[in-house]
Amino acid sequence: MLWLFYSSAIIASVILDFVGIIMSLFITVVNYKTWVKSHRISSSERILFSLGITRFFMLALFLVNTIYFVSSNKERSVYLSAFFVLCFMFLDSSSLWFVTLLNSLYCVKITNFQHSVFLLLKRNISPKIPRLLPACVLISAFTTCLYITLSQASPFPELVTKRNNTSFNISEGILSLVVSFVLSSSLQFIINVTSASLLIYSLRRHIRKMQKNATGFWNPQTEAHVGAMKLMIYFLILYIPYSVATLVQYLPFYAGMDMGTKSICLIFATLYSPGHSVLIIITHPKLKTTAKKILCFKK
């Protein structure tokens, strides 16, 4: 029964992954066309373009890896497994840093805090985006290289995977994976949760203030603020379980967990990327309008 549940979780993760690939490609193409057409692109659209490309390759790699894992009758070498792990770690870390940068940009630009740090960031963050994007990639490359360096000290044993008798022996080298993951993810988690929480608090305060004034309450600016607040709330709902599930997957005792727990972790870990991409589309005016045109929902 648990194997059936786990198989269903794998099928669900493949479907979600496929949806995420389509959504990421859509975000990339729309922002690229905007860039080519107007010969300029905003800071947020530049981040979305980078995020779309990174997520597309990350989810495509995950899909190929899953299909190969399920369909292969042959034993799987440790080198191929290590290649998939390293590429996925780099792409996943890059996409998370892009999301962190996007949330920070939204927080700084939309909130109206008068603290000197916020005012300084508000003036300087947009011009720095072209430099911060490569910095995100370099940080991801550094954490991946750190993983490789640490894994050389305690190398992975031979990893053999069979179709009908799956066996992962990763007791050695797991510490290096956990260390590199925590170094990268903990800072991302703190920045994302802080940015989202500050933005939600600021927008709620702004909306309540406008409700009290009751003059021209619902205008395009307020609608954009409400959309940003919804995006942050739903982002936290997806991101926090994803972070917990991903961390659990990298811990040594994960291999000994029952299939039910593994299935839940797999679903939460897979749901985040496509779910967040869908949220971006339905809360971004230009992406939402283009999606409606494609789906023939425009009145």
UniProtKB/Swiss-Prot annotation:
Tell me which parts of the chain lie in the Cytoplasmic compartment.
31-46, 103-131, 194-230, 284-299
Under the heading InterPro entries, the entry gives: TAS2R, TAS2R4
**Tell me, what's a Pfam family for it?**
TAS2R
* Side of membrane Extracellular, spans: 1-9, 68-81, 153-172, 252-262
Instruction: Give the GO cellular component terms, alphabetically.
Output: ciliary membrane
Q: Where in the cell is it found?
A: Membrane; Cell projection, Cilium membrane
Q: Which UniProt keywords apply?
A: Cell membrane, Cell projection, Cilium, G-protein coupled receptor, Glycoprotein, Membrane, Receptor, Sensory transduction, Taste, Transducer, Transmembrane, Transmembrane helix
Q: List the membrane topology term(s).
A: Multi-pass membrane protein
A single Gene Ontology MF term assigned here is: G protein-coupled receptor activity
Positions glycosylated per UniProt: 164-165, 169
Q: Where is it mostly found? A: membrane
Source organism, top-level taxon: Eukaryota
As for family, the record states:
Belongs to the G-protein coupled receptor T2R family.
The record describes the protein's role as:
Gustducin-coupled receptor implicated in the perception of bitter compounds in the oral cavity and the gastrointestinal tract. Signals through PLCB2 and the calcium-regulated cation channel TRPM5. In airway epithelial cells, binding of denatonium increases the intracellular calcium ion concentration and stimulates ciliary beat frequency.
Give the free-text miscellaneous remark of the entry.
Several bitter taste receptors are expressed in a single taste receptor cell.
Recorded protein name is Taste receptor type 2 member 4
Q: What organism is listed for this UniProt entry?
A: Papio hamadryas
